[in-house]
Amino acid sequence: MVSPSIEVLNSIADGKKYITSKELKKHNNPNDLWISILGKVYNVTEWAKEHPGGDAPLINLAGQDVTDAFIAFHPGTAWKHLDKLFTGYHLKDYQVSDISRDYRKLASEFAKAGMFEKKGHGVIYSLCFVSLLLSACVYGVLYSGSFWIHMLSGAILGLAWMQIAYLGHDAGHYQMMATRGWNKFAGIFIGNCITGISIAWWKWTHNAHHIACNSLDYDPDLQHLPMLAVSSKLFNSITSVFYGRQLTFDPLARFFVSYQHYLYYPIMCVARVNLYLQTILLLISKRKIPDRGLNILGTLIFWTWFPLLVSRLPNWPERVAFVLVSFCVTGIQHIQFTLNHFSGDVYVGPPKGDNWFEKQTRGTIDIACSSWMDWFFGGLQFQLEHHLFPRLPRCHLRSISPICRELCKKYNLPYVSLSFYDANVTTLKTLRTAALQARDLTNPAPQNLAWEAFNTHG
C-alpha cells in the first residue's frame, strides 16, 4: 500500500493529520483504495470486497471525495460503520460547492420528513396486481383452447414481468419489506424465480450505472455493441471498464449500427434474451456474488415453471408466438429504460465525485405523464429524481419533481422532461445521427468487401 508522501500535512493548530486531494488520488486502485466523505479519509480496500453494492462503485470513485454519492445511496445507519475504516487523515483542501450544499440540504430535509421510510401502499397494490395478472395468464393457457386467448395470455405475462421488474427495482434500491431478510427474499423471488433475471446481476450492473451515469466506458447501460451505439465516440473501440474488455467496433458492428434506428424496436422486442444470457454468465462466473446459491436456485425455478407453462400450449407455432408476444410486451419496458438515457449527454472517462449532481442532470431524461400512468412507468418516468435520490420510494418522486426542477433552474442545469412520444422521437434521432456517422467509411474501422457491398446501396 502506498504510504502518505511528503504531501501529508500536519496541523499544529488542531492536532489533526491532513492529506491533499492530490495525495488522495494516488490511492485509486483495487489494491489501494481510499475515499473521502465529508473531508474524512477512509481506507476501503478490503471493505470493497464486502460492500453490499458491489466493488464497482468504490473502484470507479476511488481516490476522490464521494460525499454526495454516499448520501444518495446510504441510509443514516451506514454512517456508524465508517469509523472502523477511518485512516486518521482529513482532506486539507476539502471544499463543498454551492450545488452540493443545496443537494445535501434537500436530502437531509427528506430524511427528517421520514420520506425514505414512508413507502405507502404501492408495494401491496403492485403485488396484488401482479398476482392477478399471473393468475389470468396461467388460466388462459391451461383452460382455453383459443389461439387468441393464448396470445392475450402471453401479453398479460409480459405486462406482469414489467410490473415485477419495477418491484425488483424497488427491492434493489431500498428496503420495501419489513426486514432486510424479507427484502432479500422478495428480490430473489420476484427477480430470479418469476422473471428469470438475477437480482445479483441487476445490482451489479445497476449500481455501476448509477455511479457512472452515461459514461461510455464505465456505464454498462450504454455498452451495447455490436448492435447499438449512442455516440460516435464508441467507434474508437473503447475499453469497457465495467466488463474489462474492448467494445470492438468492427465491420459487423458498423453494419448493425448503420441501421440501428430501424433495428431499435425489433431489438427491444427480444432484448430480454440478452438479460437471460447475462444472468447465466454471471452466475457461472468466478466473480464473487452475494447469495450465489439462492440466485442459482431462483433462476432454476424460473426455467422450470416457464417452459412447463409454454409446453401446455397445443403446438409449436403457438408456443413460439406466445413467447414472442410476452417478450414484445415487456420490450416496452426496455424502450422506457433507454429513453431515459440514450439521448442524454455522454462522456468518456471515470465518474467524478465532485460533480455528482451535474452528471445526473445531464445524463437523464424524464418522461412527462399524468399521475394515473405512474403504475405503467413504475416511477422511473422521474428518472432524474430517482438518480438524485435512489433510495426514495417511488410514491414520493412526483412530489419532489418541482423541487428538483427549481434546483436545476437555480444552477442553470438541464431538466429535460419529454412526452413518451417525443422521447421516442429524440431517441431515434440520436440513433440515426450515430448511424449516419457509422456509414462514413472515412471513420477508422476494419473494413471488408462485404461491408462495402452493403453500403453501396445506402
UniProtKB/Swiss-Prot annotation:
Its cofactor is Fe cation. Its EC number is 1.14.19.29. The keyword Oxidoreductase applies. It is a multi-pass membrane protein. Disulfide bonds: none annotated. It holds the Pfam family FA_desaturase. GO terms for cellular component: membrane. A motif (Histidine box-3) lies at residues 383-387. Keywords: Electron transport, Heme, Iron, Lipid metabolism, Membrane, Metal-binding, Oxidoreductase, Sphingolipid metabolism, Transmembrane, Transmembrane helix, Transport. It catalyses: an N-acyl-(4R)-4-hydroxysphinganine + 2 Fe(II)-[cytochrome b5] + O2 + 2 H(+) = a (4R,8E)-4-hydroxysphingenine ceramide + 2 Fe(III)-[cytochrome b5] + 2 H2O; an N-acyl-(4R)-4-hydroxysphinganine + 2 Fe(II)-[cytochrome b5] + O2 + 2 H(+) = a (4R,8Z)-4-hydroxysphing-8-enine ceramide + 2 Fe(III)-[cytochrome b5] + 2 H2O. It is found in: Membrane. The chain crosses the membrane at residues 122-142, 147-167, 185-205, 264-284, 293-313, 320-340. InterPro entries: Cyt_B5-like_heme/steroid-bd, Cyt_B5-like_heme/steroid_sf, FA_desaturase_dom, Fatty_acid_desaturase. Plays a major role as delta(8)-fatty-acid desaturase which introduces a double bond at the 8-position in the long-chain base (LCB) of ceramides with or without a hydroxy group at the 4-position. The enzyme produces both the 8E and 8Z isomers. This structural modification contributes to the quantitative partitioning of ceramides between the two major sphingolipid classes, glucosylceramides and glycosylinositolphosphoryl ceramides. Sphingolipids are important membrane components involved in environmental stress responses, such as resistance to chilling, and act as cell signaling molecules. This is Delta(8)-fatty-acid desaturase. It comes from Helianthus annuus (Common sunflower). The gene is sld1.
